[in-house]
Amino acid sequence: MHANTTQQVFQELSFNGQWRRYQQRVLDSCKTYMADGHIHLVAAPGSGKTTLGIEFIKQFGQPTLVLAPTVTIRQQWVDRITTAFLANPLHAEQLISQDLKNPKLITIATYQALHSAMIQLKGESRAEDTDDQAEIEHFDYQGFDVVATFKEHALGTLCLDECHHLRNEWWKSLEAFRNSFTSIHMISLTATPPYDDDPALWKRYITMCGQIDEEITVPELVKENSLCPHQDYVYFSFPTQEEKKQLKAIDIQKENVLHDISSDNLFIEKIQDCAALTGRISIDELLEEPKFLSATLIFLHSKGCSYPKNFQQLLAVKKLPPLDLEWFEILLQGALFTVPHWYDFTKDEVKQIKHQLRSAGLIERKQVKLCRNKERDLLLTQSLGKLKAVQEIFSSEYQSLGANLRQLILTDYIRKDFEPRLGDENAKLTQLGTLSFFESIRRETVKQQIPVALAVLTGSLVIIPTAARHRLEDLLDADRLKFLPVGCLNPNDYLKVYLFGDQHDLVGAVTQLFQEGFIQVVIGTKSLLGEGWDAPCINSLVLASFVGSFMLSNQMRGRAIRVMPNNPDKTSNIWHLISVNISKNTADNPFESSSTWANTRFNGDSPDMELLNRRMQQFLGLSYTENVIESGIERFNFGFITFTKENLTRLNEQTLLRSRLRRNLKEGWREALPIYDNMEVVQEIKIDNKIIPHVKFWDTQKLLLLTLATMASNIIFYIFQSIRSRSGQVPINIASFLLIVLGLLWLRYFLYRSPYKRLKILGKSIQKALLNKNFIQTQQTDVQVIQHDKHAISTEVFLKGGTNREKAVFTNAVLEFFAPIENQRYILKARHKVSDQTSYFAVPNLFSKNKSDAQEFANCISNKLRNYELIYTRSEEGRRILLDARIKALSNKQDRTSTKKRVISPLK
């Protein structure tokens, strides 16, 4: 395509909205960023990332390939260009292609499609994170040269949307394609940059995308009224009686299998006489995987069997813990898969044990799963107890908002097989899905006589209130619509809708009904997000989805926190469902008697809780306990409670009450957001005070010796003077001088012994090392420490200033410095014997590539802190020292560090 023609076509792309202030800030600087041919934007959901990406494409003004992670997101790009940038939507077909074989000025495809084209694949693929309307891409790229095609098309710009969420083989194809175009312009867009990835993966990401140019955060968007004040709420549910029976049956089967294995005399003898305990495995190798040695001793101890006590001394533990599922899982994992040569089981014996475990579903992909297994997790994540939870959330939200409620419930599956039973009060709800949630809430509205209009909105099934029919016919040509009864529902209440033609029109029209209040609750699937769908009216979102990536969770959450122009007081609640099993059996630990085990407790980890924990690592939100904005599950403040059914039920009641105080929520955000410009998100690292190294006192010691020498000479002088004057008294100024000097020395010692001061000095030492090697390039950064009272057991440190990546680099370096010694390449060893937990520290990975880097890091640390020598652990002497360091680390296995994000003012 000729350059002039290309420019003329691009002139037709013109944003028909008004740029927000932070968007305009990015656009004002984009020419500068584009000077090197790259622009890399990190932007929270709701910031208009896709819209900015389209504007960047226009600015570069060259044929462009946009790559998206899924088919649904690919469609979002098409919809956004059509609705927001084209005066005549009919021109979209001339401008946009979704087919790699037939590129146009803007070609939009998935990463998977590009990978398939690069390897010339023929076939189809079902995408992950989808519902009944599976995202299936059909490929026939045999004999197709995608690189040659786009070179002929004069490809000038490559736009990558969330490119780090890729499988390794897709990455390789993307890199090969990118490297085929030496002078191509790059646009990179993401809401979740891989800050915490391995340095090699981060380098790969930055090599592809370029350094991050701009970042737009959620708090910034709330501050500028581009996103509404919002809060995440956690609601606990419990399995039904039938599910409890199934869970109990799983536990009993597991208990029987484990009893048979652990009580087998041959099994016990093999463990007792294993190679690990009879000198056939080196001490060095045993300490490579100390958990397997620990599990072996714990098992034998629980059986009352003898074992060489020197191995317990090697682990530096005086008392072994009782055998439980976790330790037995570790033992079986080691014996069957990880270190089978430590044990003496024959092939037939291993085969028999594996068969026993598989029969109870306790092995998955060469991993022994006693604490958690797929069957049990599936029962919990898909527990029908969540139906009741959503009912209660709906009732509470309606009580709070009444006719103003606009609730969206997103789930994974439609469950069309239940459609004929909709409206049948006696029909049993047996699966979670769009239709079961619809029916559950519908029954609740009938029971409470609540006049709430519900709707089902998915790619293949739409149900609306009959009262909204005429308005829908106003929005769409009535001749294109077909209304049918659905299931056993009264046609006067609900109708199923078909549309002849483009289904996007129906989705848009039903969304308009939602906006106007003809519908108050929409139940849909995640695929709805890919329909170019947006509904700013949403003020209550229930994430009833248990399948999905963080990226998709981010998208779902972003739908609820958009502002509504005609409702400036809008706030939004986001609900997360957690199914937990509270049991009265001993299946958690079949190795203990019921008399010594709690009668009612949280039975095992919840997969929902694990998912929530992952989600909250990146989501910044308002803390429950104070008006601060931070990430992490700790902000919900339920870590202090015992997980009993009574406690969790009470917590649910408190959560519902809190969720109804929407005015307080808005006020909380107002107080939490700094009133200053240029707010900053920092990554706080909490560190146990016991492991913070001590400050070096060489300068103090020198000062003390010099002072004592001076004092001694002065005393001698005054004694002679006294003798000569026959006064018989040492002048009082000697004593005063002595007290002042000793007081100053004691004050210096007192100040430098505080964890706050020590951590500040350590942080600055690590910062200096990172600056010296250009891992941090922003000079205007500062290490800050949060000071607590003297009874605090931990202290927080963070890097203020710099880019988010530089903050992540600092955070990772601090975490790696304090990490338990395992098999690090370089470690630091205190030159003088110490009695606390500060004998050994690890050299962070960034400095472990070679000795000179490691030595430079060690010099920065030893310059201000207690003297440490650098140890190379791959030498013979180094291995001996590493062994000692591991032993000390094993005796201190509790969590030493943790991290979270927090928003601070630049004045703090």
Write out the residue ranges for each language-model feature.
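Conserved pre-motif I regulatory segment
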Residues: H2-V42
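Walker A/P-loop
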Residues: A35-F56
